[in-house]
UniProtKB/Swiss-Prot annotation:
Species per Swiss-Prot/TrEMBL record: Arabidopsis thaliana
Biological processes per GO annotation: cellular response to gibberellin stimulus; cortical microtubule organization; mRNA processing; protein folding; protein localization involved in auxin polar transport; response to cold
Any one cellular-component term (Gene Ontology): cytoplasm
Function: Binds specifically to cytosolic chaperonin (c-CPN) and transfers target proteins to it. Binds to nascent polypeptide chain and promotes folding in an environment in which there are many competing pathways for nonnative proteins. Together with other chaperonins, contribute to the regulation of gene expression by modulating the spliceosome function on pre-mRNA splicing post-transcriptionally by acting as a co-chaperone of Hsp90 to control levels of LSM8.
Keywords (A to Z) from UniProt: Chaperone, Coiled coil, Cytoplasm, Nucleus
Localization in the cell: Cytoplasm; Nucleus
Protein name, UniProt field: Prefoldin subunit 6
Superkingdom, taxonomy of origin: Eukaryota
Taxonomy of the source species: Eukaryota, Viridiplantae, Streptophyta, Embryophyta, Tracheophyta
UniProt main location, coarse: cytoplasm
GO MF, one annotated term: unfolded protein binding
Name of the gene encoding the protein in the UniProt record: PFD6
Gene knockout outcome: Several microtubules (MTs) defects, including hypersensitivity to oryzalin (a microtubule inhibitor), defects in cell division, abnormal cortical array organization, and impaired microtubule dynamicity, due to reduced tubulins levels. Reduced levels of PIN2 at the plasma membrane. The pfd5 pfd6 double mutant is less sensitive to gibberellic acid (GA)-mediated mobilization of PIN2 at the plasma membrane. Lower pre-mRNA splicing events and reduced production of U6 snRNA in plants lacking PFD2, PFD4 and PFD6, probably due to a reduced activity of the LSM2-8 complex.
Quaternary assembly: Heterohexamer of two PFD-alpha type and four PFD-beta type subunits forming prefoldin co-chaperone complex. Interacts with PFD2, PFD3, PFD4 and PFD5. Interacts with LSM8, a specific subunit of the LSM2-8 complex, which is a core component of the spliceosome. Binds to HSP90 to facilitate the formation of a larger complex made at least of HSP90, PFD6 and LSM8.
Length: 129
């Protein structure tokens, strides 16, 4: 094989390695975002448990900017449930994206390994010649 073929393979290997790095960075971002949503889900579930403990005529206040505003218990309950639904849906979406990215990562790794083996075979053949 010619040295230009080896150079092309090396360039291709470098490009694939860069792509793999980008995928891994995206996976890291996804994990961070997922962690944030998981924390928010836990906090909202705690709020919901606290709201469930209250009597029907209890006063509930919502912090809006620097001001506490009185809110109806049923409305507060509904808002927290909607938030939990939204966060749960986001977590499912992130899980699907993560699964897709991990598949892409595995495919890139396989491609990189095949390219490396091919390069090593070519270079070993040149060394014998």
């Amino acid at each position: 094989m010619s040295s230009s073929t080896v150079r092309d393979l090396q360039r291709d290997l470098e490009n694939k390695a860069n792509d793999l790095g980008k995928i891994q960075k995206d996976i890291g971002k996804n994990h961070q975002l997922r962690k944030k949503y998981t924390i928010q889900l836990g906090e909202n579930e705690l709020v919901l448990k606290e709201l469930d403990l209250l009597e029907e005529d209890a006063n509930v206040y919502k912090l809006i900017g620097p001001v506490l505003v009185k809110q109806d218990l049923a409305e507060a309950n509904a808002n927290v449930r909607k938030r939990i639904e939204y966060i749960s849906a986001e977590l499912k979406r992130l899980d699907a994206i993560l699964q897709d990215m991990e598949e892409k990562q595995n495919n890139k790794r396989e491609t990189i390994m095949k390219l490396q083996q091919r390069l090593q075979t070519i270079q070993a053949g040149k060394a014998k010649a």
